[in-house]
UniProtKB/Swiss-Prot annotation:
Phylogenetic classification of the source organism: Bacteria, Pseudomonadati, Pseudomonadota, Gammaproteobacteria, Vibrionales
A family per Pfam: YcgL
Coiled coil: none
Protein name stated in the entry: YcgL domain-containing protein VFMJ11_1829
Signal peptide start and end residues: none
Length: 93
């Protein structure tokens, strides 16, 4: 299965995977409004391939069922919580 990957102009780290190049018909208009003007990144064959940030099987299933897959960036790390956990761990030792 080939798909086209586009990056968002409004949300850094967001990518949209669609089956056919420049065919955004399956993507809800509200999502397209939040995504901004899509910028083509690449066309890729998903068969037998690994993707850096997402499970390729989830992408293929979403494209087959919904016509698209939206990849969002991971949530930012809460540095305060990390500090508290590290501090508590040091105090226990």
């Amino acid at each position: 299965m080939f798909c086209s990957i586009y990056k968002s102009t409004k949300k850094q780290g967001a990518y949209l995977y669609i089956e056919k190049k420049d065919d955004f018909a399956p993507v809800p208009q509200e999502l397209m409004s939040m995504f901004g003007t899509p910028t083509m990144v690449m066309v890729v064959n998903l068969e037998g391939r690994k993707l850096a940030s997402v499970d390729v099987e989830k992408v293929k299933t979403a494209i087959k069922e919904n016509g698209f897959f939206l990849q969002l960036p991971p949530p930012p790390e809460n540095l305060l919580e990390k500090y508290k956990k590290d501090k508590a761990a040091r105090e226990e030792n």
